[in-house]
Amino acid sequence: VMDIVRYACPERIYPVGRLDRNTTGVLLITNDGDLASKLTHPSFKKKKIYHVWLNKDVSIEDMQKIADGVELDDGEIHADAISYVKEDDLSQVGIEIHSGRNRIVRRLFEHLGYRVVKLDRVYFAGLTKKNLPRGKWRYLNEQEVNNLRMGAFE
């Protein structure tokens, strides 16, 4: 990813949060260290929404467990929201979380006996990947930067 934006600006830039190698989607890259801290520190609880493709249908019971909370090795995690993406394909779910713990979405589903086939972050702190082809990037507009600095988005 950093190779794609290598010449975006003269300052040092770095990713805000992380996506593992097998995850696609929204990744904010900045040269503003204060903003990066604000967006990644758990106390600021920035919303992340993922589209998750799983190896089998997710049961209603497991959907409820995820909503209520699941105990993992590093503590409990629960989704702020979870739903099926398509009515006719119960192996695809959308999940909204605020946690920034490493590989949390994958670990959550693996704990319940599922294998994540594909994971795509579709929303982060008010930003989406809408109209942005995979492997491409764009500068934020002034309003988006101001919204992030003011904490206008979860």
Provide a role label for each language-model segment:
Residues V1-E154:
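Basic, flexible Lys/Arg- and Gly-enriched helix-loop patches that mediate nucleic-acid binding at interfaces
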